Amino acid sequence: MVVKIGIIKCGNIGMSPLIDLALDERADRTNIDVISIGSGAKMGPNQVVEVTTKMVEDIKPDFIIYVGPNPAAPGPAKAREILSASDIPSVIIGDAPGIKAKDKMAEEGLGYILIKCDPMIGARRQFLDPVEMAMFNADVIRVLAGTGAARVVQNAIDDIVEAIEAGNEIELPKIVVTDAKSVAAAEFSNPYAKAKAMAAFAMAEQVANIDVKGCFMTKEMEKYIPIVASAHEMIRTAAKLVDEARELEKATDSVSRKPHGADGKRLNKTKLMEKPE
């Protein structure tokens, strides 16, 4: 059986460019097909309704992943409404602001994965250009991968695929991705590596708070520019910490790797020169 996964991307969080690739990292899985559509950087109601309706009515996958910022915002709320009314199992992947809507999403029959270390960008025109945007997102992706947060997401989606393949009832995830869940999924062997990853996670959480202050709570340009710049410096440092954590694991040949087999089976290895099983 080939499970058809539909991914809707509206706006952008760090997990957005990663989600479809993390499910088929070598592009050789025979048990899934992934179709991604999106509305680019915008996530207004009109853009979101257009792409979500297309996914539900035209593409009709076995299950849907909606990924983007703040699932409680007006645009994503429209997507939730459409997905809830459909008979297609759906999961919302979002950032920390979505936590306030998690009970509502559960009432709507939707799964959710809300990632606390996937922070808002410093979206001030005087500071943010395409280069800065790209570098920020690159740092966020390193934090998601290096702390284990991305693996939490991957495991939850793989669970859905396996349930569909087996013909079992789908249990949609209801997960708030915390530092504890992330580092547990990362399976660090070195306690110092784990500590560095926890520190990186905490820093990424604070980046979101600082960028909210700089983007929405501060009106004077001479004040908000250094505020958002400081947040970007912080995520850069967090990315360096996860690099340091991985180097510690590499030094003892104990990096946890969990590739997918061609049949979609989740494999496992730690030693560099051994085969995954």
Curated annotation (Swiss-Prot):
It catalyses: 5,10-methylenetetrahydromethanopterin + oxidized coenzyme F420-(gamma-L-Glu)(n) + 2 H(+) = 5,10-methenyl-5,6,7,8-tetrahydromethanopterin + reduced coenzyme F420-(gamma-L-Glu)(n). Keywords: Methanogenesis, One-carbon metabolism, Oxidoreductase. Residues 249-277 are annotated as: Disordered. Its EC number is 1.5.98.1. One of its GO terms (molecular function) is ferredoxin hydrogenase activity. Gene3D superfamilies: 6.10.140.120, F420-dependent methylenetetrahydromethanopterin dehydrogenase (MTD) (3.40.50.10830). Pathway: One-carbon metabolism; methanogenesis from CO(2); 5,10-methylene-5,6,7,8-tetrahydromethanopterin from 5,10-methenyl-5,6,7,8-tetrahydromethanopterin (coenzyme F420 route): step 1/1. One of its GO terms (biological process) is one-carbon metabolic process. Belongs to the MTD family. Catalyzes the reversible reduction of methenyl-H(4)MPT(+) to methylene-H(4)MPT. This is F420-dependent methylenetetrahydromethanopterin dehydrogenase. The gene is mtd.
